[in-house]
């Protein structure tokens, strides 16, 4: 049995949360926004980070060691543009990844496949 006194004395993160997106070539996340900032940092591969500036879509390409921060309320997405699977680290403000707000074009495309957005911003099958 594990000794509880040997457990690390680290608390939960406060003020931010992070995770990793491991994606095959051509895959990533569609346009969405959070009620927090979001920072992207590739661990490997080459990534397209794209966002909406009004009606115009803008894009930057990142590789390992690069970083970009996207402000609150800006639609953003990412895609692995490498020729092999790659990993992207993301950090968001707040203690969780925050509710996702999908771009209307993403919701329209999802509905055509039988999906709908639930109260948490998740795309779910319509029953």
Predicted region positions:
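Glycine- and acidic-residue-biased ligand/ion/polar-headgroup-sensing regions
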Residues: 25, 35-48, 52-53
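Histidine-centered metal-chelating micro-motifs
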Residues: 27-30, 48, 67-68, 72-77
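Double-stranded beta-helix
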Residues: 75-127
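Conserved short histidine dyad/triad with adjacent acidic residue
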Residues: 2-6, 17-34
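Short histidine-centered beta-strand/loop micro-motifs
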Residues: 6-11, 29-34, 51, 59-61, ...
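Short acidic-glycine-tyrosine-enriched beta hairpin
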Residues: 53-72
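His/acidic/aromatic-lined binding-pocket segments of jelly-roll/cupin-type domains
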Residues: 20-21, 31-32, 37-42, 60, ...
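A short, N-terminal "cap"/entry segment at the start of jelly-roll beta-barrel domains
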Residues: 1-15, 119-127
């Amino acid at each position: 049995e594990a000794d509880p006194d040997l457990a690390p004395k680290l608390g939960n993160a406060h003020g931010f949360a992070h995770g990793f997106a491991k994606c095959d070539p051509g895959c990533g996340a569609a346009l969405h926004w959070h009620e927090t900032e979001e920072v992207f940092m590739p661990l490997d591969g080459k990534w397209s980070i794209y966002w909406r500036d009004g009606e115009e879509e803008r894009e930057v390409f990142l590789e390992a060691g690069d970083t970009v921060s996207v402000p609150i309320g800006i639609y953003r997405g990412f895609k692995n543009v490498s020729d092999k699977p790659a990993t992207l680290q993301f950090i968001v403000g707040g203690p969780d990844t925050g509710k996702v707000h999908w771009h209307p074009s993403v919701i329209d495309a999802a509905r055509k496949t039988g999906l709908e957005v639930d109260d948490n911003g998740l795309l779910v099958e319509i029953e």
